[in-house]
């Protein structure tokens, strides 16, 4: 098959492309590399000076980006399959994206929408306070209020992003959810065209290390995106970790990095035993899965639903925390006080990713889905 993957979140599309290529398919990834993260791609579409304080530069960047898009789009036809990372799959205002979507629809075969991140249905599910016990938007029946959430509610529920999401979700041939949360968000509305396929991870055995804390020092790693720290709960997790560090200074080492490119992030991550991921999730993120594949323990969401959707009844590698400061403190302190737990958790982490997220296994699931719809 000839496959186009358009847009990028957390290296999902590039990793999927590697798997599809290994299975013999022709794949093109077109993206901006998820902005500052700099993920690989075949064709780059980066919008320059988008946050510049100089209005002339911002305007020039917009014009150059649009010209680049028009040039690239002429080459994006004749594919058997097109998959979009999100309804907002290019860096334009949502009301300007639909003509590009229609062009792709007209000049290619089957079109799939990825449910891989923030969109209308994820926001809506978080706000109903019943789909999830907790999420980025709720804890029980209480809504979380912060600047990020207010912006997302405005844009996705009451603005043109939500309208674009509805139009694409209703028109596309299929929707693929990469995490339990996204599947649960779309299932009430699009069960007939929704498929769950886990995120793909390259399982490189040469990089797997058990990283046993032989000197009694447990090394923690925290990656911070400053603009999303409150939204993702990193602020609470880091505060809890600092408290544990202060209580056990001889047994705890903390590394904090902020908004670094992907390759640098991975290099720094490699030195740790434990990674702190997201506080309000049921499932580990792509970054957390990458860490687990290398033999690292992840503190994140490991709720029963996340294991059930992939059919995992044995392994429990994820240190599951509830969305509270006290829960995080307790779980982190237990790791420091009982480092003998780490080897088993590390081995289970590697096995978990190998069973469910290996990029070749995941790519094969995508191939089966694509071929099924192409035959209809």
Question: Where in this protein do the model-derived segments appear?
Answer:
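Acceptor-binding helix/loop patch of EC 2.4 sugar-transfer enzymes
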Residues: 39-41, 113-159, 227, 303, ...
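A short, active-site helix/loop in glycosyltransferases that binds the activated sugar's phosphate group
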Residues: 122, 152-194, 239
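Short hydrophobic beta-strand element within catalytic cores of glycosyltransferases
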Residues: 297-304
């Amino acid at each position: 098959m000839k496959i186009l993957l358009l847009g990028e979140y957390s290296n999902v599309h590039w990793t999927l492309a590697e798997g599809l290529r290994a299975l013999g398919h022709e794949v093109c990834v077109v993206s901006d590399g998820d902005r500052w993260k700099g993920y690989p791609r075949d064709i780059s579409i980066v919008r320059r000076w988008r946050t510049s304080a100089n209005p002339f530069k911002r305007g020039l960047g917009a014009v150059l980006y649009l010209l680049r898009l028009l040039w690239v789009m002429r080459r994006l036809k004749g594919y058997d399959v097109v998959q979009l990372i999100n309804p907002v799959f290019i860096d334009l205002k949502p009301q300007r994206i639909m003509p590009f979507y229609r062009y792709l629809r007209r000049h290619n075969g089957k079109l799939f929408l990825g449910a891989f991140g923030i969109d209308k249905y994820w926001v809506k599910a978080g706000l109903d306070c019943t789909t999830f016990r907790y999420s980025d938007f709720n804890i029980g029946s209480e809504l979380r209020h912060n600047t990020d959430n207010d912006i997302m509610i405005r844009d996705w529920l009451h603005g043109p992003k939500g309208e674009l999401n509805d139009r694409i979700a209703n028109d596309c041939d299929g929707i693929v959810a990469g995490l339990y949360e996204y599947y649960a968000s779309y299932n009430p509305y699009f069960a007939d065209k929704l498929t769950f396929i886990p995120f793909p991870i390259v399982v490189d055995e040469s990089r797997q290390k058990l990283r046993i804390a032989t000197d009694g020092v447990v090394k923690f790693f925290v990656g911070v995106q400053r603009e999303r720290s409150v939204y993702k709960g990193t602020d609470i997790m880091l505060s809890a970790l600092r408290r544990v560090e202060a209580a056990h200074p001889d047994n705890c080492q903390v590394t904090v990095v902020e908004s670094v490119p992907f390759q640098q992030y991975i290099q720094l991550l490699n030195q740790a035993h434990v990674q702190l991921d997201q506080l309000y999730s049921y499932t580990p993120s792509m970054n957390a899965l990458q860490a687990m594949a290398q033999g690292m323990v992840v503190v994140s969401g490991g709720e029963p639903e996340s294991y059930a959707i992939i059919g995992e009844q044995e392994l429990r590698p994820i240190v599951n925390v509830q969305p509270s400061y006290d829960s995080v403190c307790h779980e982190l302190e237990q790791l420091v006080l009982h480092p003998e737990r780490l080897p088993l958790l590390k081995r289970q982490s590697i096995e978990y990713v190998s069973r469910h997220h290996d990029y070749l296994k995941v790519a094969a699931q995508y191939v089966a889905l694509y071929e099924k719809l192409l035959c209809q």
